[in-house]
Swiss-Prot record:
GO terms for biological process: monoatomic ion transmembrane transport; symbiont-mediated activation of host autophagy; viral process. This is Non-structural glycoprotein 4. The lineage of its organism: Viruses, Riboviria, Orthornavirae, Duplornaviricota, Resentoviricetes. Glycans are attached at residues 8, 18. Residues 1-28 are lumenal. It is found in: Host rough endoplasmic reticulum membrane; Host membrane, Host caveola; Secreted.
Length: 175
């Protein structure tokens, strides 16, 4: 842990890596050198940061397998992000949670589709009944005896007072 916080140690390791790369690659003006140095620096930093963190996590945690798995997945995801990939590595637990969420969403959508289908079937049946009621049927002779307005017709002689009760009469209003 002391060496992790020691800036001189970290700088000396970076200088050592740079000197090693310069000795391996004879051409100091090589175009890929800054990228290689950046990757090696990131790997070194991850190495120095992850080992003490994992040691502390393993000592304090009871389930060491999950901690190691989580640390490794986090490190791999960090490396993938640094490399420019948008994909991420997931554990089985995360995959199962996502699958459960997807299955719940699919069930909800299937129930909605079922309700909509039932409503559409009911609407089609209603439209069929309305269409059947609106179809005009040809009738040769119209039976007027069943018409409502033809039942109780009285002539002027059949009225009791001899006057048409529906005829308006004069009304005088006092002022």
């Amino acid at each position: 842990m002391d060496k992790l916080a020691d800036l001189n140690y970290t700088l000396s390791v970076i200088t050592l890596m740079n000197d090693t790369l310069h000795s391996i690659i004879q051409d100091p003006g090589m175009a890929y050198f800054p990228y290689i140095a950046s990757v090696l620096t990131v790997l070194f930093t991850l190495h120095k940061a992850s080992i003490p963190t994992m040691k502390i996590a393993l000592k304090t945690s009871k389930c060491s397998y999950k901690v190691i798995k989580y640390c490794i997945v986090t490190i791999i995801n960090t490396l993938l992000k640094l490399a420019g990939y948008k994909e991420q590595v997931t554990t089985k637990d995360e995959i199962e949670q996502q699958m459960d969420r997807i299955v719940k969403e699919m069930r909800r959508q299937l129930e909605m589709i079922d309700k909509l289908t039932t409503r559409e079937i009911e609407q089609v049946e209603l439209l069929k009944r309305i269409h059947d009621n609106l179809i005009t049927r040809s009738v040769d002779v119209i039976d007027m005896s069943k018409e409502f307005n033809q039942k109780n017709i009285k002539t002027l002689d059949e009225w009791e007072s001899g006057k048409n009760p529906y005829e308006p009469s004069e009304v005088t209003a006092s002022m």
